[in-house]
Amino acid sequence: MPIEIPTDLTPELVPLSWLIGEWEGRGRLGTGDEDSEHFLQHVSFTHNGLPYLQYRAESWLTDDDGTRLRPLTVETGFWALERKQLDADGGPGLVPADIVPALKSADEVEALRNSEGGFDISVSISHPGGISELYYGQIKGPQIQLTTDMVMRGSHSKDYSAATRIFGLVDGNLLWRWDVATGGEAGKGLEAHASAFLARVS
């Protein structure tokens, strides 16, 4: 399936452009074995002309046939190429970006390509319960690998120390896996948390 790049997309989002749209499908909690619970997920990646994608994922527990049982969770965040922020970029807060984007051409974006042939990315994701994740990783064509650099927890949040996520585009579908560590040293003891197979719906 060809990927259509929006005409108003800022150049540095082109490597992430295959994510843009809405996705929906089913997944399994844990290792995905016979006893793992099922869930339904709706994911959206949108853009507003600035150099990041807005991300939202809403999930529901389901029965084996896919009938919704009850809400599971919602997470929201931002995805962007990882680079130094320039004077032309917006922020912090309501400081506006320049009308002309910081990276104006494909050549300027190409200069960010890393030694492995991909692009470094950063992803921030917030969850209910006072937990926020900051991931760093790489996008290389239709494959994404992310590892938490930091997990921020409120004083009453549940224990959660690290995570990895992988995403891939396979035959036009979005596949992902999420592993987490809920105790001990960050990055140690990662266990399968969930995985899903999502089809593009718009």
Swiss-Prot record:
Cofactor(s) in the UniProt record: heme b
Q: Where is this motif: GXWXGXG?
A: 21-27
Keyword hit for Isomerase: yes
InterPro entries (alphabetical): Calycin, Nb(III)_bact/plant, Nitrobindin, THAP4-like_heme-bd
Keyword Isomerase assigned to the entry: answer is yes
**Top EC class per UniProt?**
isomerase
Superkingdom per UniProt = Bacteria
Similarity section: Belongs to the nitrobindin family.
Protein name, as recorded: Peroxynitrite isomerase
